[in-house]
Amino acid sequence: MTINLILLSLLAYVIGSIPSGLWIGKIFYKKDIRDFGSGNLGATNSFRVLGIKAGSIVTVMDILKGTVATLLPFFFQLNVDHHFWLLTGAFAIIGHSFPLFAGFRGGKAVATSAGVILAYAPLLFVAALVVFLVTLKLSKYVSLSSMIGALAALIISLFMGDWILIILVACIALFVIWRHRANITRIRNGEEPKIKWM
């Protein structure tokens, strides 16, 4: 069982490493999104560089990476405690942030982390998504909405009594904020781009 779990965790890392924004940009738009906008491989920069259609596809793909990776023990009928689903999900987040297929320079893990939560705790995902969308509607800042959504997920998880989930969501929230430190500086300086489509 231990070997199988290790192998699934490695597979989850590989799944997380799929740079959907990079590949879609190169294949369909002949653009390397790392050379434009924020230079980030995530969904937000895909929206900024490639447009709403491509950005939406990248967002869905990045969410699915987290969801599929989290459910790997279920798909392979591995008889383990369901908390181990969070382990494979965590490896997908690591893969997205430090992708094997893109020089270990990845995204900020917001969508992939959301996919992990969607697979493990769907109601928590919905609650955090609502907070994200409301914040986005009011502020027009994707970065700020992502951070507030992550913090909301952490606060809500505290009432769920699942300490393994709480620890993972706390790590996700801290990591998301850390990855957005440049965005925080730009927001404070009034230099952070706002979305125009919402």
Curated annotation (Swiss-Prot):
The cellular component terms of Gene Ontology attached to this UniProt record, alphabetical and capped at eight, are: plasma membrane
Where in the cell? Answer: Cell membrane
| UniProt keyword Transit peptide present | no
Q: List the disulfide bonds.
A: none
Transmembrane region(s): 5-25, 56-76, 84-104, 114-134, 158-178
> Which reactions does this protein catalyse?
an acyl phosphate + sn-glycerol 3-phosphate = a 1-acyl-sn-glycero-3-phosphate + phosphate
GO biological process assignments: phospholipid biosynthetic process
Q: Which family does it belong to?
A: Belongs to the PlsY family.
Record-given protein name: Glycerol-3-phosphate acyltransferase
User: From which organism does this entry originate?
Assistant: Listeria monocytogenes serotype 4a (strain HCC23)
